[in-house]
Design a protein with these regions (language model features):
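Non-heme di-metal
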Residues: 1-195
Length: 195
């Protein structure tokens, strides 16, 4: 059974150049994304306490994402970069989450799991790009470790969806959402941020 997600488009060189030109801002945004990823995993636990089969993995994922936040924060501290007092709205996430609205509570649950998978896989793809192109050796090593972890998270959410929904339903909807994500990511304004 296939758990991995293949994105429909690659991140652009223009996005990578924008990040490399203002890496401090990228780190600030990255820290915020890790904090939100931890909160998202726990929000599944809060909203779906009856889905007992996946709660242990969700808690483990939330803890791991919080550890990533701590690692990014520690790295920022060493480099003299403060957490921002206010973060910009994440247009990417807003547009993706809009795709999960409507339908039944079950289909919303399914779509939220699949969307979490796609977001983790986009993070993985972008962390890999950063690790391969940044000249700072410490940052290169850090992002190499992170992209491997994010790939695992992407797989976890597909696996969770398959516990509750038929294979065809999961993969058909996943394909639809992957195509929509490609349209969204291709139209995003360039900024030194993960999304």
């Amino acid at each position: 059974m296939k758990y991995s997600v293949e994105l429909a488009c690659d991140s652009s060189k223009a996005w990578l150049d924008t990040v490399m030109d203002d890496f401090g801002s990228f780190l600030q945004d990255h820290a915020d994304c890790e904090r939100k990823a931890s909160a998202m995993a726990m929000s599944f636990v809060a909203k779906y306490p009856n889905r007992k089969e996946i709660i242990p993995e969700l808690i483990e994922t939330a803890i791991e994402e919080l550890e990533h936040f701590q690692q990014v924060y520690n790295l920022m501290e060493r480099k003299g970069i403060a957490l921002p007092s206010e973060m910009q709205k994440d247009v990417y996430m807003q547009q993706l989450m809009a795709l999960t609205h409507g339908g039944t509570p079950d289909t919303r649950f399914r779509d939220r799991l699949l969307m979490a998978s796609i977001v983790e896989c986009r993070g993985c793809e972008r962390f890999k790009l950063v690790s391969e192109h940044i000249e700072d050796e410490e940052l290169s090593r850090f992002y190499k470790v992170l992209w491997a972890s994010e790939a695992k998270h992407g797989n976890i959410f597909v696996k969770m969806a398959l516990k509750y929904f038929e294979n065809k339903e999961v993969y058909d909807r996943l394909d639809e959402l992957i195509q929509k994500e490609a349209e969204i990511v291709s139209a995003l304004p360039l900024r030194p941020a993960l999304h």
